[in-house]
Amino acid sequence: MSTLMIGAATSEMALDAASLATGRMLEAPLRAGAFVIVHDQTPFCMISCDVIALTRDLVDEIGAGVAGTCGIPADNLLVTSTHTHHAPGTLPIYLNPRNEAFAQRTVAAAVDAARKAM
């Protein structure tokens, strides 16, 4: 008999007063959400982050973190962004550099959401 387990969770991305949104004001809490499905001991994870975009290096960091924390291989992971303009920049846009501190908080929140969804 096959087994199916499903879990979902979110983790907030902490903001500080110095964080500027990419194009607009900050309006609501920003989160990473994870949805985990384990079918016959094979795990799959989908993560969505409230950011404008995710660069390859951030996706790779999320993948490594999820693999190390949850045991879910990167090949079984889908990571996406909501493309909100109400979050600090996770990539350089025009003359604005990437907000490195927020980018790392995004990675941490994504991994934490996956951990909680397990």
Regions flagged by a language model, labelled:
Residues 1-118:
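Conserved beta-alpha junction segments in alpha/beta enzyme cores
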